[in-house]
């Protein structure tokens, strides 16, 4: 790879790593949380650093529509860096979704369990958590899908 391509790739990586999903200015904030932490693998002289953020906003009803069904916008961002004497890995996942039901808040731990080695190694963690001040409603019962293909195994 040419030096110019490497520089452009590094610049894009830094931009991607530093720019979170921004909420729409017209949306009303419903829930927000952030988590950061560090895991040390003492026996491997390695470490993992992570950050997770989630925000849920309520979208306003478009002008001229009289819909009483709310629309929630959920933005999630998970970043992780793993560093050892022989390896450096950086990963980021962003997810943006719209739904008519309020999504539950998640924790970074469920995402860390999918990170190589994070779920089965002894670790020391530092965790900061800032939960939403808004009360979470009771979860609604799960919806059941019915139709031509429901219940059919392929």
From Swiss-Prot:
It comes from the Viruses. Keywords: Transport, Viral movement protein. InterPro entries: Luteo_VPG. Pfam families: Luteo_Vpg (PF01659). Residues 83-103, 123-154 are annotated as: Disordered. Transports viral genome to neighboring plant cells directly through plasmosdesmata, without any budding. The movement protein allows efficient cell to cell propagation, by bypassing the host cell wall barrier. Belongs to the luteoviruses movement protein family. This is Movement protein.
